[in-house]
Amino acid sequence: MIRYIFITGGVVSSLGKGIASASLGALLQSRGYRVRLRKLDPYLNVDPGTMSPRQHGEVYVTDDGAETDLDLGHYERFTGVSARQSDNITTGRIYQRIIEKERRGDYLGATIQVIPHVTNDIKEFVLSDPGEGVDFVLCEIGGTVGDIEGLPFFEAIRQLGQELGPQRACFIHLTLLPYIPAAGEMKTKPTQHSVKELRSIGIQPQILLCRCDRPIPVNEKGKIASFCNVRLASVIEARDVGHIYDVPMAYHAEGLDSEVLSHFGITDAPPPDLSSWQRIAQTIKNPDGQVTIGLVGKYTDVPDAYKSVSEALGHGGLANKVKVDIRFVDSEKFDDPDAALEDLDGVHGILLPGGFGERGAHGKMRVARYARERNMPCFGICYGMQLSVVEAARNLAGIKNASTSEFGPTKEPVVGLMEEWTKGNEKVTRDASTDLGGTMRLGAYPARLKEGSMVAQVYGSLEISERHRHRYEVNASYIERLEKAGMIFSGMSPDGRLPEIVELEGHPWFIGVQFHPELKSRPFEPHPLFASFIAAAVKQSRLV
């Protein structure tokens, strides 16, 4: 029997529903249960693929090529369960699907309405394809209770709660308890009003997860329980912690997983095994050293734009038992060829993340040259790899007009638009006029590594699979000239047509990858490239 847990949020946005969902999933996993986590996003975009990182943060790509919300990255990192296209839905995708069915005549002339057609599609999404042997499906509802665009989702889960019954459905509401210094007390009224709003649409939460920055007094917990109609033990203190990987243990200490099991009447659950989380906490609290990594991109004012990269760097630190201090550096500042690169002083490694467009790209190329000439560890990802190759083509291979066609027409397209590639058994064709949404090379693709290369040593294998999200690729017709200049194309697509990994001959650690390795890194299994990169940064820190 599959049980469903719905996580909603109130009072304000950005309370951490994604981390809360991932943490609860990890706690249930630690007791031997199998979980699947899903995200329901109320916005009208079909997916976040064309949304600005400044508005939405990063786009998280799954193995099967879905462009999804960054919360799915939290789900994967905390539980190790690979997300799928079927684990993220938006209002836009639901409406798109319904309109397609209406145009085909599937509704046989019926009037299409939010209730029942939209809500039925939402319910179908929640219940469909949970996976084999899954015990719990956790569904996070994006946005805040009371948002107009979220009403169909709340109505759908209300109906599911009624249809499944309390033995199979549980509602958890994440809320805020602000502390007012002038009054010297914690205020429960926002939580009461948030729950009142939720109850007005027919949902009675069984558990309240109360975000706060200090302990909740017992009398305040009692007041919340009384006015929100929940058990006292179901008012869970979700106090701020030092690191997100402390959250599962903090929530367990407050009894969150026990309350969930109690609601479902499960009395024979095995005790949780949190030893792996405890080891991570110890490493985070007691590192053997510290390194500073310069993350050079154009969205550095919005750290969520590089969420998975930041997390993967931290995982690399865990693998090497060091703290990783990330210095976010705006690449646009370096577009001016006369601008000093003093922001890179004191860093022990440089990471050039993915991105799009010409703005900030020339600055990234200057930074790639800086790292290349100073023998500093440098890790280029996706666009970062492409720009590193363009820089080397200009300044090592002597191809003065080398550029990327992403900037516009060029005589020397060292990086060009991919027009054809293979996805499974299907040939995919694109051109410059193709729509932007969902038209990139997306999802997991295999690659073959060059025997004896640095990456082959790092991976410990000659065959790998990594996730991609790109429209441009290094032009294979330039490989011979670039290799003569000292570049090593150490990873290629199985058909030998698409360069996937590049190294720099004679450099202690200079690797560029066309894929996004950060998407497959986990705290318990740091990605080998990030572990190796941080190891190189540790070595660099001892040289300066």
From Swiss-Prot:
Catalytic activity, reaction form: UTP + L-glutamine + ATP + H2O = CTP + L-glutamate + ADP + phosphate + 2 H(+); L-glutamine + H2O = L-glutamate + NH4(+); UTP + NH4(+) + ATP = CTP + ADP + phosphate + 2 H(+)
Pathway where this protein functions: Pyrimidine metabolism; CTP biosynthesis via de novo pathway; CTP from UDP: step 2/2
Glutamine amidotransferase type-1 domain sequence ranges: 292-543
Binding site for Mg(2+): 71, 140
Taxonomic superkingdom: Bacteria
Binding of ATP, residues: 14-19, 71, 239-241
Main enzyme class: ligase
Residues reported to bind L-glutamine: 355, 383-386, 406, 471
GO CC annotations, alphabetized: cytosol
Regulation: Allosterically activated by GTP, when glutamine is the substrate; GTP has no effect on the reaction when ammonia is the substrate. The allosteric effector GTP functions by stabilizing the protein conformation that binds the tetrahedral intermediate(s) formed during glutamine hydrolysis. Inhibited by the product CTP, via allosteric rather than competitive inhibition.
Positions annotated as active site in the UniProt record: 382, 516, 518
Keywords associated with the record: ATP-binding, Glutamine amidotransferase, Ligase, Magnesium, Metal-binding, Nucleotide-binding, Pyrimidine biosynthesis
Subunit text: Homotetramer.
Protein name: CTP synthase
Species in which this protein is naturally found: Hyphomonas neptunium (strain ATCC 15444)
Lineage: Bacteria, Pseudomonadati, Pseudomonadota, Alphaproteobacteria, Hyphomonadales
Gene: pyrG
